[in-house]
Protein backbone atom coordinates (compact mmCIF):
# COMPACT_ATOMS: atom_id res chain seq x y z
CA UNK A 1 0.00 0.00 0.00
CA UNK A 2 1.31 3.46 -0.88
CA UNK A 3 2.37 5.80 1.91
CA UNK A 4 -0.21 8.44 2.77
CA UNK A 5 1.68 10.69 5.24
CA UNK A 6 5.05 11.99 4.07
CA UNK A 7 7.09 14.95 2.82
CA UNK A 8 7.93 15.09 -0.90
CA UNK A 9 10.28 17.55 -2.60
CA UNK A 10 10.74 18.74 -6.19
CA UNK A 11 12.91 21.43 -7.75
CA UNK A 12 12.80 23.73 -10.74
CA UNK A 13 15.33 25.92 -12.52
CA UNK A 14 14.79 29.20 -14.37
CA UNK A 15 15.28 29.94 -18.06
CA UNK A 16 18.70 31.43 -17.28
CA UNK A 17 20.07 28.30 -15.62
CA UNK A 18 23.01 27.18 -17.80
CA UNK A 19 21.40 23.86 -18.73
CA UNK A 20 18.16 25.63 -19.59
CA UNK A 21 20.02 28.14 -21.76
CA UNK A 22 21.25 25.15 -23.74
CA UNK A 23 17.79 23.58 -23.89
CA UNK A 24 16.41 26.87 -25.17
CA UNK A 25 19.05 27.21 -27.89
CA UNK A 26 18.60 23.59 -28.98
CA UNK A 27 14.82 23.96 -29.19
CA UNK A 28 15.17 27.27 -31.02
CA UNK A 29 17.18 25.36 -33.63
CA UNK A 30 14.42 22.73 -33.84
CA UNK A 31 11.86 25.50 -34.41
CA UNK A 32 14.09 27.10 -37.03
CA UNK A 33 14.27 23.91 -39.10
CA UNK A 34 10.56 23.11 -38.69
CA UNK A 35 9.73 26.64 -39.84
CA UNK A 36 11.62 25.97 -43.07
CA UNK A 37 10.40 22.36 -43.42
CA UNK A 38 7.77 20.72 -41.15
CA UNK A 39 9.41 17.35 -41.80
CA UNK A 40 12.99 18.40 -41.08
CA UNK A 41 15.06 16.17 -38.81
CA UNK A 42 16.99 17.71 -35.94
CA UNK A 43 19.12 16.35 -33.11
CA UNK A 44 20.83 19.41 -31.66
CA UNK A 45 23.05 19.49 -28.58
CA UNK A 46 24.37 22.73 -27.06
CA UNK A 47 27.24 23.49 -24.70
CA UNK A 48 27.45 26.90 -23.02
CA UNK A 49 30.25 28.24 -20.85
CA UNK A 50 31.95 31.57 -20.23
CA UNK A 51 31.42 33.62 -23.40
CA UNK A 52 31.19 30.53 -25.59
CA UNK A 53 28.39 28.49 -27.18
CA UNK A 54 29.03 25.27 -29.10
CA UNK A 55 26.32 23.47 -31.08
CA UNK A 56 26.69 19.94 -32.44
CA UNK A 57 24.38 17.31 -33.85
CA UNK A 58 22.63 15.98 -36.90
CA UNK A 59 20.05 17.60 -39.16
CA UNK A 60 18.18 17.00 -42.38
CA UNK A 61 16.71 20.14 -43.83
CA UNK A 62 17.33 23.14 -46.07
CA UNK A 63 20.70 24.87 -46.05
CA UNK A 64 18.91 28.18 -45.53
CA UNK A 65 18.05 27.01 -42.01
CA UNK A 66 21.62 26.00 -41.29
CA UNK A 67 22.80 29.46 -42.29
CA UNK A 68 20.54 31.02 -39.62
CA UNK A 69 21.57 28.88 -36.64
CA UNK A 70 23.95 31.41 -35.10
CA UNK A 71 21.40 34.22 -35.35
CA UNK A 72 18.74 32.06 -33.72
CA UNK A 73 21.11 31.06 -30.91
CA UNK A 74 22.01 34.67 -30.15
CA UNK A 75 18.38 35.76 -30.17
CA UNK A 76 17.52 32.96 -27.73
CA UNK A 77 20.19 34.14 -25.29
CA UNK A 78 19.09 37.75 -25.73
CA UNK A 79 15.49 36.82 -24.95
CA UNK A 80 16.60 35.09 -21.75
CA UNK A 81 18.36 38.30 -20.77
CA UNK A 82 22.10 37.68 -20.74
CA UNK A 83 24.10 40.88 -21.20
CA UNK A 84 26.86 40.20 -18.65
CA UNK A 85 30.61 40.43 -18.95
CA UNK A 86 31.01 36.65 -18.75
CA UNK A 87 28.08 35.81 -21.04
CA UNK A 88 26.61 38.35 -23.44
CA UNK A 89 24.31 37.49 -26.32
CA UNK A 90 26.21 39.70 -28.77
CA UNK A 91 29.72 38.78 -27.69
CA UNK A 92 29.96 35.05 -27.00
CA UNK A 93 32.11 32.97 -29.33
CA UNK A 94 29.91 30.67 -31.42
CA UNK A 95 30.85 27.34 -33.00
CA UNK A 96 28.49 25.14 -35.02
CA UNK A 97 29.14 21.46 -35.76
CA UNK A 98 25.77 20.41 -37.20
CA UNK A 99 25.98 17.84 -39.99
CA UNK A 100 23.71 15.54 -41.98
CA UNK A 101 21.61 12.91 -40.22
CA UNK A 102 22.95 9.37 -40.49
CA UNK A 103 21.54 7.55 -43.51
CA UNK A 104 21.27 4.40 -41.38
CA UNK A 105 18.97 6.16 -38.92
CA UNK A 106 16.99 7.92 -41.65
CA UNK A 107 16.16 4.66 -43.43
CA UNK A 108 14.55 3.31 -40.26
CA UNK A 109 12.40 6.39 -39.77
CA UNK A 110 11.38 7.16 -43.35
CA UNK A 111 8.17 5.70 -44.71
CA UNK A 112 8.40 3.48 -47.78
CA UNK A 113 6.08 1.71 -50.16
CA UNK A 114 5.95 -1.28 -47.83
CA UNK A 115 6.15 0.34 -44.38
CA UNK A 116 4.93 3.24 -42.26
CA UNK A 117 7.31 5.68 -40.61
CA UNK A 118 9.27 4.04 -37.82
CA UNK A 119 10.42 5.32 -34.46
CA UNK A 120 13.66 7.29 -34.49
CA UNK A 121 15.13 5.14 -31.72
CA UNK A 122 14.30 2.47 -29.21
CA UNK A 123 13.29 3.51 -25.72
CA UNK A 124 10.74 3.76 -22.95
CA UNK A 125 8.67 6.86 -22.24
CA UNK A 126 6.40 7.72 -19.32
CA UNK A 127 3.43 10.02 -18.92
CA UNK A 128 1.80 10.96 -15.64
CA UNK A 129 -1.06 12.99 -14.24
CA UNK A 130 -2.61 13.43 -10.81
CA UNK A 131 -5.32 15.58 -9.28
CA UNK A 132 -3.12 17.53 -6.83
CA UNK A 133 -3.32 20.78 -8.83
CA UNK A 134 -5.64 22.28 -11.47
CA UNK A 135 -2.94 21.53 -14.05
CA UNK A 136 -3.13 17.85 -13.02
CA UNK A 137 0.54 17.95 -12.05
CA UNK A 138 2.37 16.96 -8.85
CA UNK A 139 2.11 19.87 -6.42
CA UNK A 140 5.80 20.21 -5.37
CA UNK A 141 6.93 20.64 -8.98
CA UNK A 142 3.95 22.80 -9.92
CA UNK A 143 4.74 25.33 -7.18
CA UNK A 144 8.50 25.16 -7.81
CA UNK A 145 7.86 26.15 -11.42
CA UNK A 146 5.31 28.79 -10.44
CA UNK A 147 7.70 30.57 -8.05
CA UNK A 148 10.37 30.91 -10.72
CA UNK A 149 7.90 31.95 -13.42
CA UNK A 150 6.62 34.69 -11.13
CA UNK A 151 10.14 35.96 -10.44
CA UNK A 152 11.00 35.80 -14.15
CA UNK A 153 7.96 37.89 -15.05
CA UNK A 154 9.01 40.49 -12.47
CA UNK A 155 12.53 40.57 -13.91
CA UNK A 156 11.37 40.95 -17.51
CA UNK A 157 8.79 43.61 -16.59
CA UNK A 158 11.37 45.66 -14.69
CA UNK A 159 9.56 45.31 -11.35
CA UNK A 160 12.63 43.45 -10.03
CA UNK A 161 15.22 44.69 -12.51
CA UNK A 162 18.09 43.71 -10.20
CA UNK A 163 17.32 40.01 -10.58
CA UNK A 164 19.56 38.01 -12.91
CA UNK A 165 18.36 35.31 -15.31
CA UNK A 166 19.75 32.34 -13.33
CA UNK A 167 17.65 30.89 -10.50
CA UNK A 168 16.59 27.67 -8.81
CA UNK A 169 13.72 26.73 -6.52
CA UNK A 170 12.89 23.73 -4.36
CA UNK A 171 9.61 23.07 -2.56
CA UNK A 172 8.96 20.38 0.07
CA UNK A 173 5.31 19.63 0.80
CA UNK A 174 3.72 17.76 3.68
CA UNK A 175 1.18 15.14 2.58
CA UNK A 176 -1.58 13.97 4.90
CA UNK A 177 -3.80 11.09 3.79
CA UNK A 178 -2.11 11.35 0.41
CA UNK A 179 -2.98 15.02 -0.17
CA UNK A 180 -0.60 18.01 0.01
CA UNK A 181 -1.48 20.36 2.88
CA UNK A 182 1.45 22.76 3.44
CA UNK A 183 5.07 23.53 2.64
CA UNK A 184 7.68 22.35 5.14
CA UNK A 185 10.53 24.17 3.38
CA UNK A 186 11.11 26.43 0.39
CA UNK A 187 14.51 27.13 -1.17
CA UNK A 188 15.10 29.87 -3.75
CA UNK A 189 18.51 30.79 -5.10
CA UNK A 190 18.38 33.70 -7.52
CA UNK A 191 21.07 35.65 -9.32
CA UNK A 192 21.13 39.34 -8.43
CA UNK A 193 22.99 42.60 -8.89
CA UNK A 194 25.94 43.02 -6.55
CA UNK A 195 24.54 46.17 -4.92
CA UNK A 196 21.30 44.62 -3.62
CA UNK A 197 21.26 43.56 0.07
CA UNK A 198 20.30 39.96 0.79
CA UNK A 199 17.45 41.04 3.08
CA UNK A 200 15.86 42.98 0.21
CA UNK A 201 16.20 39.91 -2.01
CA UNK A 202 14.66 37.72 0.69
CA UNK A 203 11.64 39.98 1.13
CA UNK A 204 11.06 40.26 -2.62
CA UNK A 205 11.23 36.50 -3.04
CA UNK A 206 8.95 35.99 -0.03
CA UNK A 207 6.22 38.08 -1.68
CA UNK A 208 6.32 35.95 -4.80
CA UNK A 209 6.31 32.68 -2.85
CA UNK A 210 3.30 33.84 -0.83
CA UNK A 211 1.48 34.81 -4.02
CA UNK A 212 2.09 31.37 -5.53
CA UNK A 213 1.40 29.02 -2.62
CA UNK A 214 -2.18 28.41 -1.46
CA UNK A 215 -3.25 30.38 1.61
CA UNK A 216 -1.78 28.98 4.80
CA UNK A 217 0.80 26.83 3.04
CA UNK A 218 3.90 28.98 3.66
CA UNK A 219 6.71 27.17 5.44
CA UNK A 220 8.18 28.30 8.80
CA UNK A 221 10.66 31.17 8.66
CA UNK A 222 13.58 28.97 9.70
CA UNK A 223 13.03 26.66 6.71
CA UNK A 224 12.59 29.45 4.15
CA UNK A 225 15.98 29.67 2.44
CA UNK A 226 16.87 32.46 0.00
CA UNK A 227 20.39 32.45 -1.46
CA UNK A 228 21.69 30.35 1.44
CA UNK A 229 25.33 30.83 0.33
CA UNK A 230 24.86 34.57 0.93
CA UNK A 231 25.67 35.73 -2.61
CA UNK A 232 24.68 34.84 -6.18
CA UNK A 233 26.13 37.47 -8.51
CA UNK A 234 28.07 35.24 -10.92
CA UNK A 235 25.58 32.96 -12.63
CA UNK A 236 24.46 31.32 -15.82
CA UNK A 237 27.03 29.77 -18.14
CA UNK A 238 29.71 32.04 -16.66
CA UNK A 239 29.24 30.34 -13.29
CA UNK A 240 28.63 26.76 -14.45
CA UNK A 241 28.87 25.13 -17.86
CA UNK A 242 25.52 24.11 -19.32
CA UNK A 243 24.47 21.21 -21.54
CA UNK A 244 21.26 20.28 -23.33
CA UNK A 245 19.17 17.59 -21.70
CA UNK A 246 20.45 17.66 -18.12
CA UNK A 247 17.21 18.70 -16.41
CA UNK A 248 14.90 15.86 -17.41
CA UNK A 249 13.22 15.58 -14.00
CA UNK A 250 12.55 19.33 -13.88
CA UNK A 251 11.14 19.00 -17.41
CA UNK A 252 8.68 16.27 -16.44
CA UNK A 253 7.22 15.38 -13.02
CA UNK A 254 9.77 16.40 -10.41
CA UNK A 255 10.52 12.82 -9.41
CA UNK A 256 6.89 11.99 -8.64
CA UNK A 257 6.72 9.61 -11.61
CA UNK A 258 9.16 7.36 -13.48
CA UNK A 259 11.30 8.70 -16.32
CA UNK A 260 12.49 6.72 -19.32
CA UNK A 261 15.80 8.59 -19.45
CA UNK A 262 15.50 10.42 -22.75
CA UNK A 263 15.68 14.21 -22.86
CA UNK A 264 13.30 16.29 -24.98
CA UNK A 265 15.04 19.49 -26.07
CA UNK A 266 16.85 19.64 -29.38
CA UNK A 267 14.84 16.78 -30.89
CA UNK A 268 12.34 16.93 -33.73
CA UNK A 269 9.09 14.97 -33.18
CA UNK A 270 10.23 11.84 -35.04
CA UNK A 271 12.26 11.21 -31.89
CA UNK A 272 9.91 9.23 -29.67
CA UNK A 273 11.88 10.32 -26.60
CA UNK A 274 9.95 13.53 -27.08
CA UNK A 275 6.76 12.78 -29.01
CA UNK A 276 5.83 9.56 -27.20
CA UNK A 277 6.44 11.17 -23.80
CA UNK A 278 4.07 13.94 -24.86
CA UNK A 279 1.52 11.34 -25.97
CA UNK A 280 1.80 9.45 -22.69
CA UNK A 281 1.21 12.66 -20.72
CA UNK A 282 -1.75 13.51 -22.96
CA UNK A 283 -3.40 10.15 -22.33
CA UNK A 284 -2.68 10.14 -18.60
CA UNK A 285 -4.03 13.68 -18.22
CA UNK A 286 -7.24 12.80 -20.04
CA UNK A 287 -7.75 9.74 -17.82
CA UNK A 288 -7.49 11.88 -14.67
CA UNK A 289 -9.52 14.75 -16.17
CA UNK A 290 -12.28 12.25 -17.01
CA UNK A 291 -12.45 11.19 -13.36
CA UNK A 292 -11.38 7.62 -14.14
CA UNK A 293 -8.46 7.82 -11.68
CA UNK A 294 -6.83 10.28 -9.29
CA UNK A 295 -3.37 9.23 -10.51
CA UNK A 296 -2.32 7.67 -13.78
CA UNK A 297 1.07 6.51 -15.05
CA UNK A 298 1.46 5.35 -18.65
CA UNK A 299 4.54 3.71 -20.14
CA UNK A 300 5.13 3.31 -23.87
CA UNK A 301 8.03 1.49 -25.53
CA UNK A 302 9.39 1.53 -29.08
CA UNK A 303 12.07 0.01 -31.31
CA UNK A 304 13.98 1.96 -33.94
CA UNK A 305 12.37 1.65 -37.35
CA UNK A 306 9.23 -0.05 -35.98
CA UNK A 307 5.97 1.79 -36.60
CA UNK A 308 4.00 0.77 -33.52
CA UNK A 309 4.56 0.67 -29.74
CA UNK A 310 5.93 -2.59 -28.38
CA UNK A 311 4.02 -2.16 -25.12
CA UNK A 312 1.46 0.06 -23.43
CA UNK A 313 1.40 -0.09 -19.61
CA UNK A 314 -1.08 1.69 -17.33
CA UNK A 315 -0.98 2.03 -13.54
CA UNK A 316 -3.56 4.04 -11.62
CA UNK A 317 -1.90 3.39 -8.23
CA UNK A 318 -5.04 2.00 -6.67
CA UNK A 319 -7.05 5.13 -7.50
CA UNK A 320 -8.70 3.86 -10.67
CA UNK A 321 -12.45 3.60 -11.10
CA UNK A 322 -12.23 1.28 -14.13
CA UNK A 323 -10.40 -1.86 -15.22
CA UNK A 324 -6.85 -0.98 -16.29
CA UNK A 325 -6.71 -3.58 -19.08
CA UNK A 326 -9.89 -2.22 -20.62
CA UNK A 327 -8.57 1.31 -20.15
CA UNK A 328 -5.43 0.38 -22.09
CA UNK A 329 -7.53 -0.99 -24.94
CA UNK A 330 -9.75 2.10 -25.03
CA UNK A 331 -6.79 4.49 -25.11
CA UNK A 332 -5.24 2.62 -28.03
CA UNK A 333 -8.55 2.94 -29.88
CA UNK A 334 -8.74 6.68 -29.21
CA UNK A 335 -5.19 7.49 -30.29
CA UNK A 336 -2.92 5.98 -32.93
CA UNK A 337 0.32 5.47 -31.00
CA UNK A 338 2.53 4.93 -34.02
CA UNK A 339 5.21 7.63 -34.32
CA UNK A 340 3.36 9.20 -37.24
CA UNK A 341 0.00 8.81 -35.50
CA UNK A 342 1.26 10.71 -32.47
CA UNK A 343 2.68 13.54 -34.58
CA UNK A 344 -0.54 13.88 -36.57
CA UNK A 345 -2.88 13.65 -33.57
CA UNK A 346 -0.97 16.26 -31.56
CA UNK A 347 0.13 18.22 -34.67
CA UNK A 348 3.77 18.20 -33.60
CA UNK A 349 5.43 19.07 -36.93
CA UNK A 350 5.34 22.76 -36.09
CA UNK A 351 7.78 25.28 -34.55
CA UNK A 352 6.35 25.06 -31.03
CA UNK A 353 9.31 23.87 -28.97
CA UNK A 354 11.41 26.82 -27.76
CA UNK A 355 8.61 27.77 -25.36
CA UNK A 356 8.82 24.33 -23.71
CA UNK A 357 12.47 24.71 -22.72
CA UNK A 358 11.84 26.28 -19.29
CA UNK A 359 9.26 25.78 -16.52
CA UNK A 360 8.23 22.32 -17.61
CA UNK A 361 6.94 20.60 -20.72
CA UNK A 362 3.78 19.59 -18.85
CA UNK A 363 1.13 21.38 -16.83
CA UNK A 364 1.02 24.30 -19.26
CA UNK A 365 -1.95 25.88 -21.02
CA UNK A 366 -2.43 24.86 -24.68
CA UNK A 367 -1.61 27.72 -27.06
CA UNK A 368 -3.77 28.92 -29.93
CA UNK A 369 -1.01 28.10 -32.44
CA UNK A 370 -0.82 24.46 -31.33
CA UNK A 371 1.80 24.74 -28.61
CA UNK A 372 1.33 22.34 -25.70
CA UNK A 373 -1.31 20.43 -27.65
CA UNK A 374 -0.56 17.43 -25.42
CA UNK A 375 -2.14 19.35 -22.52
CA UNK A 376 -5.60 19.31 -24.11
CA UNK A 377 -8.33 17.24 -22.45
CA UNK A 378 -10.32 16.58 -25.60
CA UNK A 379 -10.58 12.82 -24.98
CA UNK A 380 -12.57 13.21 -21.76
CA UNK A 381 -16.03 12.75 -23.29
CA UNK A 382 -14.95 9.72 -25.31
CA UNK A 383 -13.35 8.13 -22.25
CA UNK A 384 -16.47 8.64 -20.16
CA UNK A 385 -18.66 7.15 -22.89
CA UNK A 386 -16.41 4.10 -23.10
CA UNK A 387 -17.05 3.31 -19.44
From Swiss-Prot:
Originating species: Rhodospirillum centenum (strain ATCC 51521 / SW)
Binding site for ATP: 17, 166-168, 231-232, 240, 246-247, 263, 267
Co-factor binding details: Binds 2 divalent ions per subunit.
CDD domains from the UniProt entry: S-AdoMet_synt
The protein, known as: S-adenosylmethionine synthase
UniProt binding sites for Mg(2+): 19
Location of the protein in the cell: Cytoplasm
Lineage: Bacteria, Pseudomonadati, Pseudomonadota, Alphaproteobacteria, Rhodospirillales
Enzyme class: transferase
Region (Flexible loop): 101-111
